[in-house]
């Protein structure tokens, strides 16, 4: 059952890309995505060591892919709404999308566009680019420090300060740390691509609302 979970999840995401979702199911998936992201954020902040949350890169990839698929699904519903009725856009897109959009934009398209421009600067230029650079530097420094750490373990073992079991544990920890930061480097690049795609999708939604708003 566990071996079939990942293929089933990937297949479900592909189905969402092709088949239009009912607004109720989309609302449930959006709420679940927000809840999972919040739990991941809290868990990541409360950890003292990176290896205490070693599954974070894989979870980050999964939730990023889920968010991208939900963005595409919500955009399909928005673009498929009746253009002659602007109210239908929010109704078809679901309560979560319309409610969050109305809360952030305050019911004004101009305010929504300004908020969108600010989010572009903050998310892409500051957060995403900075996180990508931090992941690259950390992964590089971790890999460069591996030989020195291995030599230190061998020196402690030769001096009798630690036994073979402790040396094996430390070597495994160094390898796991290098794997973690390497995976984070790849995941950060995936997140950056998702940020670009999300900004483009949001821009398309704004243009759609421009043409569907009453003159």
Regions found by a protein language model. Name each.
Residues 4, 27-35:
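Structural signature of hydrophobic alpha-helical transmembrane segments
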Residues 33-44:
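Central hydrophobic cores of alpha-helical transmembrane segments in multi-pass inner-membrane proteins
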């Amino acid at each position: 059952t566990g071996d079939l979970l990942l293929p089933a999840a990937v297949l479900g995401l592909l189905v969402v890309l092709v088949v239009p979702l009912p607004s109720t199911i989309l609302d449930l998936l959006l709420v679940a995505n927000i809840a999972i992201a919040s739990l991941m954020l809290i868990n990541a902040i409360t950890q003292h060591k990176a290896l205490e949350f070693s599954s974070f890169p894989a979870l980050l990839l999964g939730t990023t892919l889920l968010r991208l698929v939900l963005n595409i699904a919500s955009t399909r519903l928005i673009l498929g709404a009746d253009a002659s009725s602007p109210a239908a856009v929010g109704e078809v897109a679901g309560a979560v999308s319309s409610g969050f959009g109305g809360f952030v934009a305050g019911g004004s398209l101009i305010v929504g566009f300004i908020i969108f421009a600010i989010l572009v600067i903050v998310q892409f230029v500051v957060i995403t680019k900075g996180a990508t650079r931090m992941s690259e530097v950390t992964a590089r420094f971790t890999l460069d420090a591996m030989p020195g750490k291995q030599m230190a373990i061998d020196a402690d073992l030769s001096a009798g300060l630690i036994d073979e079991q402790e040396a094996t544990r430390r070597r495994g920890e160094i390898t796991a740390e290098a794997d973690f930061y390497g995976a984070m480097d790849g995941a950060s690049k995936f997140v950056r691509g998702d940020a670009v795609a999300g900004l483009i999708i949001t821009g398309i939604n704004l243009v759609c609302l421009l043409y569907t708003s009453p003159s």
